[in-house]
């Protein structure tokens, strides 16, 4: 059967299932696809298809992630589900699967477990803006008081990590019961089965509670410089991929990073050897810049809307350190370690001044496979912002991946 083409006339949102191992994330993901497939708005995916998540590489790290897509009447969704806990950590820190919101799956029979907390913390640290809770396996629990207790505990937990615990929607249901109903009759519609209805209820909550993200083109202009050359008689051209926003001829832009910030005017925009009036997010473009010499600008600088991004040398980061098997270090490192930090298009040397274990407790050294918070000082200022991803490299190979959690100076 030919796959129907998804129409792009609905807003697009990226979400994912998070939560403790065996609480039912993958089963719920399968139930959502099968439920919405009955409306012709998804390709039904079985548990095994999702569970056998393919490997992909992000920033030099291998991660297993399953991607499914579906739509509700309101929106088009891309949904990620990871088989293993380590895959979540890597996925969220590398930003391989950017999430605009998450469905936190919690088994009512267990309540919040260690990875439930860890995933909420991770979501907070890497900037997942909103969470909707699916209280799963309620078919195995007919104690209303106990369910209310679990909900209360979850709301308090979410609040303690700065999410809006009081107002987050918590939907009760059973991914397995919904999946069985849909498997038994793939044409089951809303109103036919109480468990399937819970899936619709969950998707209504996701539709209404998780805000539509601002599109990249609507954000302030930013392009990381990849290459620079001069065109005789015309001036200096900086090339790169426009990360966000738009740029038009005669726009004023700032050149940020490595040296003092300078202002220049865009006098020409080229793409594939053709001139354009405007470049936008996703374009690989060359920008002709007024009054700059080739030596004034270098790879690793960014061109940005004035005032939208500033250069910094010191930041705190949330980091995953690769294991030896993943191509990382074989030995631990200590405070004072000086690797390269690869940000956008360039490596900058920096010193890891201090670090703590992820829960804030002291750590003497960092072992391959650890997740830590670190304080970094770079030798040159570069354009940095909260939520930005970076890789840590040594001799050209990636030994860690991180996200900026706070700018220090």
From Swiss-Prot:
Positions of the UniProt region annotated as G2: 60-64
* Region of interest (G5), residue spans: 174-176
Region annotated G4, chain positions: 136-139
Encoding gene per record = tuf
| Enzyme class, broadest EC rank | hydrolase
Q: Cross-referenced InterPro entries, in alphabetical order?
A: EF-Tu_GTP-bd, EF-Tu_GTPase, EFTu-like_2, EFTU_2, G_TR_CS, P-loop_NTPase, Small_GTP-bd, T_Tr_GTP-bd_dom
What is the annotated role of this protein in its UniProt record? GTP hydrolase that promotes the GTP-dependent binding of aminoacyl-tRNA to the A-site of ribosomes during protein biosynthesis.
> What is the designated name of this protein?
Elongation factor Tu
State where Mg(2+) binds: 26
> GTP-binding: present as a keyword of the record?
yes
Q: Which family does it belong to?
A: Belongs to the TRAFAC class translation factor GTPase superfamily. Classic translation factor GTPase family. EF-Tu/EF-1A subfamily.
